[in-house]
């Protein structure tokens, strides 16, 4: 069995879990949301600001970092933590999802993938071994196995072939991974929306990865199918290992997944929305470009303690986006990340206190009601 990175379960409420992930770069309370720092930066945020939201772990991307600035350069400069000024844990995506999405620019074979850079057209190759090697050079706290993200929709035969390839690659990743105290390697469960393939994938991975991701979801299958796949897959995974749902998602997606037993999440949604004037709030989603906010002196979310909400009005954010000022995306990105972290803290507290079902009802009712005062007024 591989050594080190561990999860301490503290409470369970139904299938939901509150735990602490222990790593070489610090402890992370779960459930946790990981802001996405694809190119060694969380877009529109200083890393001190990311820390101020309550984030305990961030995500980097192997594909983007290997192309620019390069893994060797990052390693020579002290590793990704020093390079991007983030002392806490970093999880790196293996690069598989990005490479597979290149379609016409890549060629897949049983040993790996040859692809052209989207930046300059240069040719590169990723294999399970080279992906692990790059992630080691980056000094990732959590390394992800290199896999093929199954397309959606896929026939059962296509999904089976893709899953089997990913399982062979996972075994090679496990062999290539160099264990260190407080570092870990996560396997990725594949199989699309087919329960029998998900079962086969879990069996093939075995129980000696440090954690397990559920991949191949949030790719167009819809929430009902995603939750059904989680309902089948999560109980098959080792109880004492962290469970990571990749690329998810909306607050309601996260709530439903936490209630099913997921511990870790990442998604570009809060940062991307922040750059396009969409605010996630305790009252649902607001578009700050909407004319209804032009004279609205209230904070975006009265329950939020971020700078956008404690220092500025909805009218000011509306003005910034209408004027094309860069401060608008900066403030709203901070707000969205702050809201996501607040959501995770609330879910953790509810699990610890055995009131998650009640908390979920309250959250969903508030999201559905929206900004009632303005609507009624």
UniProtKB/Swiss-Prot annotation:
Zn(2+) binds at residues 304, 306, 309, 335. Residues 247-253, 271-275 are annotated as: RNA binding. The keyword Zinc applies. Its cofactor is Zn(2+). This is Queuine tRNA-ribosyltransferase. Homodimer. Within each dimer, one monomer is responsible for RNA recognition and catalysis, while the other monomer binds to the replacement base PreQ1. InterPro entries: ArchSynthase1/Queuine_TRR, TGT, TGT-like_sf, tRNA_ribo_trans-like. Binds 1 zinc ion per subunit. The keyword Ribosomal protein does not apply. Keywords: Glycosyltransferase, Metal-binding, Queuosine biosynthesis, Transferase, tRNA processing, Zinc. It is an enzyme of class 2 (transferase). Belongs to the queuine tRNA-ribosyltransferase family. GO terms for cellular component: cytosol. Substrate binds at residues 93-97, 147, 190, 216. GO terms for biological process: queuosine biosynthetic process; tRNA wobble guanine modification; tRNA-guanine transglycosylation. It comes from the Bacteria. GO terms for molecular function: metal ion binding; tRNA-guanosine(34) queuine transglycosylase activity. Pathway: tRNA modification; tRNA-queuosine biosynthesis. It catalyses: 7-aminomethyl-7-carbaguanine + guanosine(34) in tRNA = 7-aminomethyl-7-carbaguanosine(34) in tRNA + guanine. Its EC number is 2.4.2.29. Catalyzes the base-exchange of a guanine (G) residue with the queuine precursor 7-aminomethyl-7-deazaguanine (PreQ1) at position 34 (anticodon wobble position) in tRNAs with GU(N) anticodons (tRNA-Asp, -Asn, -His and -Tyr). Catalysis occurs through a double-displacement mechanism. The nucleophile active site attacks the C1' of nucleotide 34 to detach the guanine base from the RNA, forming a covalent enzyme-RNA intermediate. The proton acceptor active site deprotonates the incoming PreQ1, allowing a nucleophilic attack on the C1' of the ribose to form the product.
């Amino acid at each position: 069995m591989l050594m080190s990175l561990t999860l301490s379960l503290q409470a369970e409420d139904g299938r939901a879990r509150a735990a602490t992930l222990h790593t070489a770069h610090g402890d992370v309370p779960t459930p946790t949301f990981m802001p996405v720092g694809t190119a060694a930066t969380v877009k529109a945020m200083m890393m001190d600001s990311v820390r101020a939201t309550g984030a305990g772990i961030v995500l980097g991307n192997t594909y983007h970092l290997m192309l620019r600035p390069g893994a060797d350069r990052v390693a020579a400069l002290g590793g990704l933590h020093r390079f991007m000024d983030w002392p806490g844990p970093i999880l790196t995506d293996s690069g598989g999802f990005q490479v597979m999405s290149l379609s016409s620019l890549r060629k897949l074979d049983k040993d790996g993938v040859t692809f052209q850079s989207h930046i300059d057209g240069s040719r590169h190759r990723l294999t399970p071994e080279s992906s692990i090697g790059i992630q080691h050079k980056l000094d990732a706290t959590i390394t992800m196995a290199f896999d093929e993200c199954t397309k959606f929709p896929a026939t059962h035969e296509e999904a089976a072939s893709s899953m089997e390839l990913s399982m062979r690659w996972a075994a090679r990743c496990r062999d290539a991974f160099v264990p260190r105290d407080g570092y870990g390697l996560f396997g990725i469960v594949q199989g699309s929306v087919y329960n029998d393939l998900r079962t086969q994938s879990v069996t093939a991975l075995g129980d000696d990865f440090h954690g397990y991701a559920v991949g191949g979801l949030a790719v167009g299958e819809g929430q009902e199918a995603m939750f059904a796949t989680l309902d089948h897959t999560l109980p098959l995974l080792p109880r004492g290992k962290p469970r990571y749902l990749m690329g998810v998602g909306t607050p309601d997606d996260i709530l439903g997944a936490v209630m099913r037993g997921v511990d870790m999440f990442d998604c570009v949604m809060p940062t991307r929305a922040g750059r396009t004037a969409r605010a996630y709030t305790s009252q649902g989603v607001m578009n700050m470009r909407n004319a209804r906010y032009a004279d609205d002196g209230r904070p975006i979310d009265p329950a939020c303690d971020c700078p956008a909400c404690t220092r500025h009005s909805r009218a000011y954010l509306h003005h910034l986006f209408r004027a094309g000022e860069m401060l608008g995306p900066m403030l709203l990105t901070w707000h969205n990340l702050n809201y996501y972290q607040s959501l995770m803290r609330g879910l953790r507290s509810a699990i610890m206190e055995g009131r998650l079902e009640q908390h979920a009802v309250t959250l969903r009712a508030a999201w559905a009601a929206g900004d009632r005062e303005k609507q009624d007024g």
